[in-house]
């Protein structure tokens, strides 16, 4: 037993650790959406969840974070204070669980007060930041029992939103098209980017690899900030196969076919 008057000695180790900012997971479906917003130079009123990390470089698109549900009400407030033209390069971003928690009432207020603006619901089918709990739109209770699932697109339409667009978060061309079209409208628009959290699917995925002989060192694949991507000393890029989830975002950005799937026999 160890008593109060006893002393103990231990060796102290001094480690030199690389400074690292908090970032989205490899393969996170939010990363492609934020890449598009960054590319289009659109600001985002943020909310509480994994997607808050969109404030961190190199994505750097989330400019406000107050509390759960405040992304939509912040966008609403900007529109009323500064006018609809001011928010043409702004969107609100909010997760599916947070939208059902306190975002839906903010969207109701936008409709009630005849606001304009674009809301992006980042629907990853879970409550990712706090441990992957189910919520009212997943179809399961917290005990894992089947239950009624709230239909988020139908809920938005029931509130009165006429412009409800659903896209695959992995399809960055579709995301970009939807964002460009909806922010141009003088009405409330809701874009729902629907792709499950990468941590929910434990199945084996195809991996990607780079061909340094084809790499032009342009850095396009590095812009989304995937932690599996590393720039080598010579400017080419390598992919860490222990971190790659096979999402394919990097390959979709490479114009030189320098990133391709690893063949099954080459793993």
Which residues make up each language-model segment?
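Acidic-glycine-rich active-site phosphate/pyrophosphate-binding loop
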Residues: 41-56
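Glycine/aspartate-rich loop-and-adjacent alpha/beta segment that forms the canonical ThDP
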Residues: 181-232
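Short, ordered loop/turn segments at secondary-structure junctions
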Residues: 49, 122-125, 169, 195-196, ...
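Iron-sulfur cluster-binding cysteine motifs and their immediate structural context
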Residues: 216-238, 245, 249-266
């Amino acid at each position: 037993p160890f008593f109060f008057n006893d002393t103990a000695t231990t060796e102290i180790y001094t480690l030199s650790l690389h400074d690292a900012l908090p970032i989205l997971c490899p393969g996170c479906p939010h990363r492609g959406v934020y890449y598009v917003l960054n590319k289009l130079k659109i600001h985002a009123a943020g909310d509480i969840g994994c997607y808050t990390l969109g404030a961190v470089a190199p994505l750097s698109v989330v400019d406000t974070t107050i509390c759960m549900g405040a992304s939509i009400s912040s966008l609403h407030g900007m529109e009323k204070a500064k006018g609809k033209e001011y928010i043409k390069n702004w969107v609100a971003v909010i997760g599916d669980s947070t939208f059902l928690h306190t975002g839906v009432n903010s969207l109701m207020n936008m409709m009630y007060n005849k606001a304009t603006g674009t809301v992006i619901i980042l629907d990853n089918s879970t409550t990712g930041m706090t441990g992957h709990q189910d919520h009212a739109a997943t179809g399961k209770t917290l005990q894992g029992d089947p239950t009624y699932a709230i239909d988020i697109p139908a809920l938005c339409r029931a509130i009165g939103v006429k412009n409800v667009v659903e896209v695959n978060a992995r399809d960055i061309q579709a995301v970009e098209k939807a964002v460009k079209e909806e922010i141009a409208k003088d009405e409330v628009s809701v874009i729902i980017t629907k792709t499950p959290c990468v941590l929910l699917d434990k199945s084996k995925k195809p991996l990607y690899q780079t061909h340094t002989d084809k790499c032009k060192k342009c850095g396009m694949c590095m812009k989304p900030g995937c932690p599996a991507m590393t720039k080598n000393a010579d400017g080419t890029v390598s992919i860490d196969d222990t971190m790659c989830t096979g999402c394919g975002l990097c390959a979709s950005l490479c114009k030189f076919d320098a990133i391709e799937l690893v063949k099954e026999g080459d793993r």
